[in-house]
Amino acid sequence: MLAKRIVPCLDVKDGKVVKGVQFRNHEIVGDIVPLAARYAQEGADELVFYDISASAKGAIVDKSWVSRIAERIDIPFCVAGGIKTAEQAREILAFGADKISINSPALSDPSLIRRLHDEFGRQCVVVGIDSFYDAGSGNYTVKQFTGDEAATKDTRWHTLDWVEEVQRQGCGEIVLNVMNQDGVRQGYDIEQLLKVRAICDVPLIASGGAGTMAHFAEVFTDARVDAALAASVFHKGIINIGELKQFLVSQGIAIRLTE
């Protein structure tokens, strides 16, 4: 059995790490490189960095901090933010990133996934999906440009349909960002994750809702995800990654422990 992964997420805006609740009201929580180094030291399996305002502004992630992170940490990391071409992806990988992630640009041009797949290989291409649950209709739908509340918009995609499409295009991994759960620390959306898991043949990362160590155990056991992503519980020191991993081992979950 492959070990489950713990993945801290660092949302970056104007050169600082920020965190919001349900993708709104972002506050500064720290500097990029020191936080990245701290999480690597605590035992994170990999890191994800989202330049959350890049796509909404028509910009691309600031590559200067990518190289600084690569110099400081020795675990894999993934970078997202306005990547629209293979050339832009190549530059970010050259600066030291191990994977690139696309979200809004893929919604604008789904064939971008295939082009990145053909250029760099499936294992390098992650697709982030910002999924919103509409209680009125009971539908899960995909939002675009969520890094800027004023720019966020609906798309024509239902979440499960988009999950199937990004796999058809060749993505190597999916991060399901559950917008309703983001930052509220009430647990992952197991019901939605199970629906996605049933049609997802690539590694699936759960994002949105972690508040306790038990929430991580629950999402691994009940939703059968490959990795759990979280932000505020790590940024605010609510959960230590090393202690979390020890807890998960005690629950019988396969996890990589650091020495």
Swiss-Prot record:
InterPro entries assigned: Aldolase_TIM, His_biosynth, HisF, IGPS_HisA/HisF, RibuloseP-bd_barrel
Entry's transmembrane regions: none
Predominant location category: cytoplasm
Record flagged with keyword Signal: no
Catalytic activity annotation: 5-[(5-phospho-1-deoxy-D-ribulos-1-ylimino)methylamino]-1-(5-phospho-beta-D-ribosyl)imidazole-4-carboxamide + L-glutamine = D-erythro-1-(imidazol-4-yl)glycerol 3-phosphate + 5-amino-1-(5-phospho-beta-D-ribosyl)imidazole-4-carboxamide + L-glutamate + H(+)
Domain of life the protein comes from: Bacteria
Active site (UniProt): 11, 130
Pfam families from the UniProt entry: His_biosynth (PF00977)
GO molecular function, one term: imidazoleglycerol-phosphate synthase activity
Disulfide topology: none
Pathway: Amino-acid biosynthesis; L-histidine biosynthesis; L-histidine from 5-phospho-alpha-D-ribose 1-diphosphate: step 5/9
GO terms for cellular component: cytoplasm
Family: Belongs to the HisA/HisF family.
Annotated function: IGPS catalyzes the conversion of PRFAR and glutamine to IGP, AICAR and glutamate. The HisF subunit catalyzes the cyclization activity that produces IGP and AICAR from PRFAR using the ammonia provided by the HisH subunit.
Assembly and interaction partners: Heterodimer of HisH and HisF.
HAMAP family xref list: HisF
UniProt-recorded name of the protein: Imidazole glycerol phosphate synthase subunit HisF
Organism: Shewanella amazonensis (strain ATCC BAA-1098 / SB2B)
